[in-house]
A protein has these predicted regions:
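Extended catalytic cores of very large enzyme megasubunits
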Residues: 1-205
Length: 205
């Protein structure tokens, strides 16, 4: 219809393409590419880098977006200010935009819905910046932290290794809680054992 936005067109394409995944699994990658275009437009425009981008342009835009993301995240009090002391030029050059194409639709949609940092419902964290932010948080106390961050990034972005959910959520942020487990003490009697089971169930809830 007249006046339809590009964002609404992408939403319609995503709804249409994802219904075909059961018929042809490769549609999962097609749908992920459409969602990726929407995310790039959303994040890059919010960060003031660009309104739209081609894949080739992302090799120039990703380093710029990393710098802008760190600055904006610190400004919004979402990211650890220590991240700004990294050599962001070196880290930006290590980002591989082609790794964005490794995502299936479900994987990218899950990150979009739950993991990417956002402000007022605008996602301004791109997939490779997400992995680099996690890597920077993990390497923040290392001696050679830029190279360690790049090593962590390469493992994460290639899907050779994936951190647990608390690490993905919190690494590099103002809430650097990276553990996904808790230690509890249990009294050595029947009442204590079953009380601990109840406490753990409530904690999981």
């Amino acid at each position: 219809y007249d006046g339809v936005s590009i964002s609404d067109m992408r939403a319609s394409l995503i709804m249409s393409a994802r219904t075909k995944v059961e018929l042809e699994p490769n549609y999962s990658y097609v749908t992920a590419r459409i969602l990726l275009d929407e995310l790039r437009s959303e994040a890059l425009s919010f960060l003031g880098v660009a309104e739209q981008s081609t894949q080739q342009e992302m090799f120039d835009y990703y380093p710029k977006a990393l710098q802008a993301f760190i600055e904006k995240g610190i400004e919004l009090e979402m990211l650890n200010p220590e991240l700004k002391t990294f050599d962001l030029n070196k880290l930006g050059k290590a980002i591989n935009p082609d790794n964005d194409f490794k995502f299936t639709y479900l994987g990218l949609q899950t990150l979009y819905d739950r993991y990417f940092i956002h402000s007022n419902d605008i996602r301004y964290e791109l997939p490779q910046i997400f992995f680099m932010r996690v890597a920077m948080g993990l390497a923040i106390e290392e001696e050679d932290r830029e190279n360690r961050a790049i090593e962590f990034y390469n493992l994460l972005s290639s899907f050779d290794y994936m951190s647990s959910t608390p690490t993905l959520f919190n690494s590099g942020t103002m809430r650097p809680q990276l553990s996904s487990c808790y230690l509890t003490t249990i009294p050595d009697d029947l009442d204590g054992i079953f009380s601990a089971m109840k406490d753990n169930a409530l904690l999981s809830k």
